Amino acid sequence: MVKVIDIGRVVVKVLGREAGRKAVVVDVVDENYVLITGPKTLTGVKRRRVNINHIEPTDKKVEIKRGASDEEVIKAVEAAGLVEYMRERVKPKMLGLTKAEVK
């Protein structure tokens, strides 16, 4: 399955300490990594590089430019009316893995 991960796409982190939190893709680093931000003041996700296998894209997208600052991302999320959606935490789908298989 090919994931549609482009700039401005809202994603859910499925692995790591921020699992279940939503973030926005700010830049595509290469075929395996993207740069995401919550921003931290909105969702608790700091700007960081993550493996695309650790995120799951949603059907939501905000209009931002490549490398947008946290302030620009917040304005775009507010303009799209997604503030409450971004603050919601979800139970991440573990992509078919059992808890014992996740290390």
From Swiss-Prot:
Any Gene Ontology biological process: ribosomal large subunit biogenesis
One GO MF term attached to the UniProt entry: RNA binding
GO terms for cellular component: cytosolic large ribosomal subunit
Entries under InterPro entries matching the protein: Rib_uL2_dom2, Ribosomal_eL14, Ribosomal_eL14_arc, Ribosomal_eL14_KOW, Translation_prot_SH3-like_sf
Keyword list, A-Z: Ribonucleoprotein, Ribosomal protein
Coiled-coil ranges from the UniProt annotation: none
Membership in a protein family: Belongs to the eukaryotic ribosomal protein eL14 family.
Full protein name: Large ribosomal subunit protein eL14
